[in-house]
Amino acid sequence: PVSVYSEINLMSRLIINGGKPLNGTVKVSGSKNAALPLIAGSILCDETKLTNVPRIKDVESMLEIVGALGGEYKWTGENEVTINTKNLQSKPLPETARKLRASILFAGPMLARFGRVEMPYPGGDLIGARPIDTHTNSFITLGAGICSGESMCLSAEMLSGGKIVLEETSVSATENIILLASGIEKNVEIRLAASEPHVQSLCHFLTKCGIQISGIGTATLKIRGKKLPLKNSTHAVIPDELEASAFAVLGAVTRSNLVISGVEFEYLDSVLLQLEKMNVNFSASENSIKIEPPSKPY
């Protein structure tokens, strides 16, 4: 079946004829922002099984990069993929990585596994201060050397532990450092770390793989890595909290009877708080939110 997202990608514009209440149940998709670092993290293991994976272009592109490096992946269900990187090779990432900003997430695990990574600058950003500076500066702190040009090249004969204070609270930089640190058999501390749900999800995945991580969900992470490969693991991609929030607001503003299933309440505190402040008529069960028409105006 074709997803809503793939249909939208084929359109030049989207026209919505609204003004009507909705009725029914909608299931929240897996989070793209959580899935992409997990795919990059599969490089640290021989085999990884991911469930609740959104079938969207960025995910497919990320998997294709794994394949180009000598790994294998197979969709074993509609939203379930098994990734095997036992025979992964140390070679430059393909040119297609330039078109995917999330490809920067391969830098950390490739450097941890092979001591070297070469890849196109994501987005082709070569001029001025780059969004990846927080990544590369952190890698240098942990013992990597960098050579620049038309492609980004990092190498390290011996990676070290240490404390990193992020120049900005960058989600992708936090994830990249976590991935690199997981392959270093020393202590790494990250200060001013991002704490978004997908960062926490990556940490939980890596703890399943045998990595010691403390401070998950806070601005200070302490990581003790291990010799690679890490333990094989199965991990469910968390539901997309942004999508759940959007559906909740949609149900409220259209005064609908709408059930939003497959939600993760751990990451929805702020959304539920705002719904309460707006006097939205809703109820929460084990993994769903039910939005009902208001008994009085908002």
Q: Positions of the model-derived regions?
A:
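Short, structured segments at the rim of ligand-binding sites
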Residues: P1-Y298
